[in-house]
Amino acid sequence: MSMTRRDFVKTSFAGLPLYAALAGKIDSTVNGVRLGTITYSFRELPRTPGALDAVDVDIKALTECGIGEIELFSPDLQPRLPREDLRKWRLSTPMEHFKALRKKFEDAGIALFAYTVNFRNDFTDDELEKSFEQAKALGASIIAASTQLSVARRLVPFAERHKVYVAMHGHSNVQDPDEFSGPESFSRALAMSKYFRINLDVGHFTAANFDAVTFIRDNHDNITHLHLKDRKKNDGPNMPWGEGETPIKQVLLLLKERKYPIRAFVEYEYRGTGTPIDEVKRCMSYMRRALA
């Protein structure tokens, strides 16, 4: 039986059993709005010497920040290898490896809401298949993808076979018709598959001169989660939160007032004065104050 978008909201966004089970461990929900981060925010933190991934570093950082729900950035799970060696790693690493990583996060009280895979044209079909298998092994029902419309078409049979949702992440490049940036590009993706959704980057959307508040209000059933950053309009720079033109507070209040089950995740990209942990803490505090 096919699942409608409204059914998807009720089942996935309202809280899958895993998320509900973990809610009492690290709870980063404020007045009904579920806050978190993409682990890309911690990309500058050094890995543990000898480690092939950044999982332990991520867990320590998330615990310090009091974050209980995340989008897991796939490069954090991978050894740093040349492209062809990384392809071999993707194809040969057993799913038990990813299940073990999932358990590490679960044991730390952190729920994996989404898994980032930035699909590119050079991904083979075997790599696409493995990416969806990895998401399932990690317990993530959503893959968040920075990709292109031309690549999205290739993802349709994989998403539908695995019943894993792919949430398209946009940027501010409105000149390239193959890039996700504005409402029209997202509409084209949604028309491709019932398993396609939107991971709206509120900062990039604002920098591309679109109205994030109106878009969320009109499309909330199709939005899985938000990436929050504070950019200026006209493709302007990333700024410390509160110094740009992105309506972060208004977006958060919309989620709170309308009770939309859309996650709000920090994506730390501006040039901060502290460590990534310091800056993510500042962003989390900003959101908590906005929702108080």
Regions found by a protein language model. Name each.
Residues L149-F158:
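Active-site-adjacent beta->alpha loops and helix N-cap segments on the catalytic face
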Residues S2-I142, E160-A167, S172, D221, ...:
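N-terminal pre-domain/capping segments
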Residues Y40-F42, F73-P75, V117-R120, Q148, ...:
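Active-site beta-loop-alpha junctions enriched in small/polar residues
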Residues I59, F132, A152, P183-S187, ...:
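Extracytoplasmic/secreted envelope proteins and their assembly/folding machinery
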